[in-house]
């Protein structure tokens, strides 16, 4: 099972809100996930990025690969040094 950190869309039409989740790479974008480790709200000014730093670091240390977008959000938030994105 290859674990990835990626965004799962939530919110309503025209007002997206995303959860940063750890999930199996074979699961659909908004499907079943292992754990939610953060949130991203692009509707606020400036966009709001939140992470549970302890759980984020746990998943990165266990080999979870962040998506390109999640890797960029981690850099913006300055929470951890992500592994290279796939």
From Swiss-Prot:
Keywords: Ribonucleoprotein, Ribosomal protein. The keyword Membrane does not apply. Gene3D superfamilies: 3.30.1320.10. GO terms for cellular component: cytoplasm; small ribosomal subunit. Pfam families: Ribosomal_S16. The keyword Translocase does not apply. InterPro entries: Ribosomal_bS16, Ribosomal_bS16_dom_sf. One of its GO terms (molecular function) is structural constituent of ribosome. SUPFAM superfamilies: Ribosomal protein S16. GO terms for biological process: translation. It comes from the Bacteria. Belongs to the bacterial ribosomal protein bS16 family. This is Small ribosomal subunit protein bS16. It comes from Myxococcus xanthus (strain DK1622).
């Amino acid at each position: 099972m290859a674990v990835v950190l990626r965004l799962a869309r939530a919110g309503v039409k025209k007002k997206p809100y995303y959860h940063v989740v750890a999930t199996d790479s074979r699961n659909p974008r908004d499907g079943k996930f292992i754990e939610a480790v953060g949130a991203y709200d692009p509707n606020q000014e400036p966009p709001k990025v939140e992470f549970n730093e302890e759980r984020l670091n746990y998943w990165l240390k266990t080999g979870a690969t962040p998506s390109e977008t999640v890797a960029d959000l981690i850099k913006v938030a300055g929470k951890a040094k992500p592994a290279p994105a796939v």
